[in-house]
């Protein structure tokens, strides 16, 4: 049985990955920050060596130093290391669709942070897997996901303003978890982009989610925000958000 050490279990993505890994028969060991501080570099190294994971998946927020330290120890111990990054590394002055050959130019602190983590991870561990993901969609309320954002906008304003000129990187959370878990089963080291959006606008996605969930939202079309941060990379086999949502509302 594979043992996977997983950070970020209080977030949105890590619990979905944990569920998928357990479904595949893996043992999941959550990183408890209360027991092992990310700021204690010796404790970090000691903990990884004690757990002896076959892989470590890093989803949590934390310092770039922590990400680098974990990547380095995994390289020394022969454990796979997967860092979950973000489409936010691309600045709003850059226009997609993006491929792995497009160099990020982050325009905010979060994007700069994620890009720094990527660079330090790959410098510390040349066998690391780095995966940039987009906005996650869970077909339910709660957590940091698109449905929760849309539902809150509906509650606050009585409608949802959605641009037809914004093409966001996004994917269904469960599909993201499947792809990330699958990457541990033989994906070569390197950079990957994980995006299930086939090219839909934010307005199209919001309308489709309203229909799929029978949410009763009022989605108003506008052109106020213009950006394409869609990412293109077919290697991890993402399912189209359009296909998944169409299937959901057709049931």
Predicted feature residues:
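Catalytic helix-loop patch of NAD(P)-dependent Rossmann-fold dehydrogenases
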Residues: 94-131, 138
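Mid/C-terminal beta-alpha module of Rossmann-like enzyme folds, strongest
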Residues: 158, 179-231
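Amphipathic terminal alpha-helices
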Residues: 2, 21, 234-251
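NAD(P)-dependent short-chain dehydrogenase/reductase
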Residues: 119-168, 175
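NAD(P)H-binding glycine-rich loop region in Rossmannoid oxidoreductase-like domains
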Residues: 36-77, 89
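Conserved glycine-rich Rossmann-like NAD(P)H-binding loop of the short-chain dehydrogenase/reductase
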Residues: 26-35
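N-terminal Rossmann NAD(P)H-binding glycine-rich loop of SDR-like oxidoreductase domains
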Residues: 2-24
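SDR active-site strand-loop-helix element
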Residues: 7, 31, 59, 81-87, ...
């Amino acid at each position: 049985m594979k043992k996977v050490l997983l950070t970020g279990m209080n977030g949105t993505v890590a619990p979905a990955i944990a569920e998928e890994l357990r479904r595949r028969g893996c043992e999941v060991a959550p990183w408890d920050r209360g027991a092992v501080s990310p700021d204690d570099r010796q404790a970090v190294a000691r903990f990884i060596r004690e757990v002896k994971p076959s892989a470590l998946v890093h989803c949590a927020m934390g310092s770039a130093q922590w990400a680098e330290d974990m990547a380095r120890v995994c390289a020394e111990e022969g454990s796979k290391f997967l860092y979950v990054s973000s489409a936010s590394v691309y600045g709003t002055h850059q226009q997609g669709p993006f491929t792995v050959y497009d160099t990020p130019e982050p325009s905010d602190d979060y994007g700069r942070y994620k890009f720094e983590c990527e660079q330090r991870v790959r410098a510390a561990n040349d066998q690391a897997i780095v995966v940039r993901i987009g906005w996650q969609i869970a077909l339910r309320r709660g957590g940091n996901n698109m449905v929760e954002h849309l539902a809150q906008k509906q509650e606050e304003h009585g409608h949802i303003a959605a641009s037809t000129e914004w093409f966001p990187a996004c994917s269904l959370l469960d599909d993201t978890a499947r792809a990330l878990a699958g990457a541990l089963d033989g994906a070569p080291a390197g950079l990957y982009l994980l995006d299930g959006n086939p090219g839909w606008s934010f307005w199209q996605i919001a309308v489709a989610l309203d229909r799929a969930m029978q949410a009763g939202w009022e989605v108003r079309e506008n052109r106020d925000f213009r950006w394409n941060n869609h990412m293109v990379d077919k290697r991890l086999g993402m399912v189209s958000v359009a296909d998944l949502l169409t299937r959901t509302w057709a049931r």
